[in-house]
Every structure is written in C-alpha cells, then in structure tokens.
C-alpha cells in the first residue's frame, strides 16, 4: 500500500475490519513488524486523539516514531506553489519533503482545509505533494476532505456493537460554536456507504456535503424522521462553504 487516504485504498473492507479486530484482541502480537522502521508524523494542525493513538499504534508494532509540528520548532514552510518567498517562511515544502522522506520509512500527515476556497481544499495540495515527492508510503491523519483513520475506527466500533447485519446508521448535523471542516463527515459518509449500511444523513438545508461523499446515502432534512429506527447515531458538526 503506497498511500492510505480514503476507503478505496484499504482494499477488501471486510478483511481489513477482521484483521483490525484480531490485532485489537492482542495488541502486541506484531511487535517485530516495525523493527528498525521509523514513522514520521507531521502535523500542520493540532491534534490530540489522532496524535496519541497513531503514535501508540506505531509503538505497538515496534516502530521508532518521530513527531514534527510544522511551523512550531521547525522552519516555517511555504505550501503554496509559484509564490515569491520574501516573507517569514524560510523553506518551501517541496524542498523539505525529500529530506523528510530520507529519514523515515512511513509518513503520516495532518493538514486541515483552509476553508476559503472549496476547489483548492479538494485538491488536497499538501497531502498530495507528500504522496508524489516523499518516496515513502503516506497516510492521512486528517486532511482537507477526509479523516480515514477516524472513519475506520468508527466502522470497527459499529461492527463490534451491531445487533443486525445491516444496521441503520444516521449521521446528524449538530451545532458547534466554531466553524468545523467537513473532513470527518465526508469520510464517515464514504466509509458507511462502502460498508453498505442503511445510511441516512440529516442536516439543515444549506449544509449539504459534496455529492461524491454523500453517494448512495439518503438525505433527510427532518431530523426526527431521519432518526426513526436508528441503530447508531453519529452526531457531528460541520460548516458550509459559502
């Protein structure tokens, strides 16, 4: 696997879930797998759970782990292409990526949407540059449009607790004081569709997600109606592109 950024990258989903559950039952059965291997975790944005859980997972596999908070404790990096570098950013990301790749075996990247231009966000410029230029397998620890690690964990939780083969899963928009990006709901929708659950999305009008993530899900603006008969409810806030 050269990259893990979306559900399609994981291959056979049922097999992936089964293997994840097997590892969960005995977290230390593959401690030799990562011997003499190094994971580099790069954070362009803050993280708590993803940072800790990913680092712990790598340690369980016997890997060495390096963590870099970009623009904090390292040179500020310019991520836009074609700009004049006469500001406070000392190095361009394209120059730094091969250097980073030379010191590790796997790279995890966390880079949020700027939420100013949807088309630009959906290009996933930062993540894609690592995939193209690092020479290493790259996985997303949340990007502009998806959060595959969280969605995989959500799917595993549903599989562990479901009482019927094809449960009804409802993702409902919830209020939040801050404007949150769409990566988590996009990704959750993608994974629920891939799992072929009875999947419903409910939100106020104007908060529609991109059709490529909604997929085969039913969209119901009436929250009460959407929640009827739900086996699992996933509450998440997201902002709308204006």
Where are these regions (language model features)?
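A short acidic, often aromatic-flanked loop/helix-cap motif at beta-alpha or helix-coil junctions
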Residues: 11, 144-149, 208, 224-228
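Phosphate/diphosphate ligand-binding glycine-rich loop within oxidoreductases
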Residues: 34-41, 47-159
């Amino acid at each position: 696997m050269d990259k893990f950024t979306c559900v399609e990258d994981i291959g056979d989903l049922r097999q992936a879930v089964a293997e994840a559950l097997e590892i969960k039952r005995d977290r230390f059965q593959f401690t030799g797998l990562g011997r003499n291997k190094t994971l580099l975790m790069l954070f362009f944005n803050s993280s708590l759970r993803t940072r800790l859980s990913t680092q712990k997972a790598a340690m369980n596999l016997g890997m060495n782990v390096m963590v870099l908070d970009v623009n904090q404790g390292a040179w500020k990096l310019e991520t836009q292409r074609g700009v004049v570098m006469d500001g406070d950013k000392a190095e361009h990301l394209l120059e730094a990526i091969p250097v980073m790749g030379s010191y590790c075996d796997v790279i995890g990247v966390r880079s949020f949407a700027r939420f100013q231009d949807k088309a630009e966000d959906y290009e996933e410029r930062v993540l894609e540059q690592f995939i193209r230029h690092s020479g290493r397998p790259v996985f997303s620890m949340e990007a502009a449009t998806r959060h595959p690690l969280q969605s995989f964990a959500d799917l595993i939780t549903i599989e562990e607790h479901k009482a019927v083969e094809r449960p009804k899963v409802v993702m409902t928009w919830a209020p939040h004081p801050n404007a949150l990006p769409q990566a988590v709901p996009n990704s959750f929708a993608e994974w629920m569709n891939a799992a072929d659950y009875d999947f419903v999305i409910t939100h106020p009008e104007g908060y529609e997600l991109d059709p490529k993530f909604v997929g085969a899900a039913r969209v119901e603006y009436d929250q009460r109606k959407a929640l009827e008969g739900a086996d699992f409810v996933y509450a998440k806030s997201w902002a709308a592109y204006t």
